[in-house]
């Protein structure tokens, strides 16, 4: 229209980006090289934005990876469920899983504590590091773009790393109901770690040391 807005605008704002010709995205890695390239992509994303003031970014989802706060909510919900006659039996049924989560509470809050103390740097992070958020060249299978930027917020590099390993190196689909099929492919774990370290060139020694805890923490959050 004359106001520069198309007929379907409805008064909102739209972000327009160039169409990535000859690009593909993957729901799961088809080769080790695919997973490696995605790791390089997300590591490079963090590294390239290392000098951007992360604190100026709007938090689309406040406390998104504040694991200690998630445990606080978990405790409150658990107490309410125990006091509810209809929900209390379900608490008993899930006793083993509840115990599993509670036994790991101290470790799960460690990264947030290290961030709060400044031991781990707050960075610009993607916060949705699934493989399908990387566009690869269909012919060369090399990185073209990192997409889906609506959750870019201040965070820890370890969360981006951990979320993609959790998703991409799993031995089962995200919605698999048979938990006996769910595990971590250590070979893909190694492939991704090498690619991420190559892309995120300025990881601090402490960040590198804590990478495995990033995977455990994100898995517990979910």
What are the language-model segments listed below?
Residues 10-23:
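Conserved short submotifs of the Hanks-type protein kinase catalytic core
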């Amino acid at each position: 229209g004359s106001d520069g807005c198309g007929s379907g605008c409805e008064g909102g704002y739209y972000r327009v980006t160039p169409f990535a010709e000859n690009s593909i995205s993957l729901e799961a890695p088809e080769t080790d090289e695919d997973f490696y390239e995605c790791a390089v992509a997300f590591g490079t994303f963090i590294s390239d934005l290392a000098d951007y003031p992360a604190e100026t970014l709007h938090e689309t989802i406040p406390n998104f990876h504040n694991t200690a706060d998630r445990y606080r909510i978990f405790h409150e919900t658990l107490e309410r469920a125990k006091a509810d006659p209809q929900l209390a039996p379900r608490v008993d049924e899930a006793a083993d899983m509840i115990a599993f989560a509670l036994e790991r509470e101290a470790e799960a809050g460690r990264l947030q504590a290290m961030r709060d103390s400044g031991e781990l740097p707050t960075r610009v992070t993607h916060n949705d590091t699934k493989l399908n958020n990387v566009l690869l060249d269909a012919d060369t299978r090399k990185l073209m773009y990192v997409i889906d930027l609506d959750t870019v917020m201040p965070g820890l590099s370890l969360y981006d790393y951990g979320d993609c390993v959790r998703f991409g190196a799993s031995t089962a689909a995200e919605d698999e109901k048979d938990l006996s099929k769910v595990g971590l492919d250590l070979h893909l774990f190694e492939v991704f770690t090498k690619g991420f370290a190559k892309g995120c060139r300025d990881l601090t020694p402490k960040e590198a040391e804590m990478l495995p805890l990033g995977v455990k923490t994100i898995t517990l959050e979910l």
